[in-house]
Design a protein with these regions (language model features):
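Feature detects amphipathic, helix-rich regulatory segments
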Residues: 1-171
Length: 171
């Protein structure tokens, strides 16, 4: 497949691009040749699809938003929900929990790198609250994750070489 890599074209989502609740691409993300991507159009991701790590940090998931729409994920586990029953952000939030990751690791295979088999992924049973509750849970967990991220970034923002040594925070 590497012969179809390009500097521009259809974005390729790799397992390493998927972080908890978000996609973090390298400075130069991999793109695919448009003709090759068109031949594989059934793999194109749509807004609201949940993309889950298949190899590596298995179980980690994020939701496709506008900037990733149309991308392709070949080596990822891709889930499209019926949004009248299951909020994709709730599903991704659940996939990122310790409970789900413990399950994923307990059924993983591989020699050195963990693999989450589709067969085991499809056996997963999830308790699904009402859509309203799913929305509230997703919003709350996302807000907590933003606060955690900001606290993790604080040392980089509070007077070090990254910002020229200026003290930006009171300590």
């Amino acid at each position: 497949m590497t012969e179809n890599y390009r500097d521009s074209g259809t974005l390729l989502i790799r397992n390493s691009d998927i972080k908890e609740g978000q996609f973090l691409f390298s400075e130069n993300p991999i793109h695919l040749d448009e003709e090759f991507a068109e031949k594989n159009k059934t793999r194109r991701l749509q807004i609201g699809d949940v993309v889950t790590v298949h190899t590596g940090d298995i179980g980690t998931s994020a939701v496709i938003e506008e900037k990733e729409a149309g991308a392709i994920g070949f080596a990822t586990i891709n889930t499209r929900t019926d949004k009248s029953i299951l909020n994709p952000y709730f599903l991704a939030t659940y996939f990122n929990t310790e409970k789900h990751k413990c399950y994923a690791n307990s059924v993983s295979t591989g020699d050195g790198r963990s693999n989450y088999n589709i067969k085991d992924f499809n056996k997963l049973v999830i308790s699904v609250p009402t859509l309203d509750e799913q929305e509230r849970i997703s919003v709350l967990i996302n807000a907590i994750n933003i606060i955690i991220t900001l606290h993790q970034q604080e040392p980089f923002l509070c007077g070090n070489s990254v910002n020229g040594g200026r003290k930006l925070c009171s300590q």
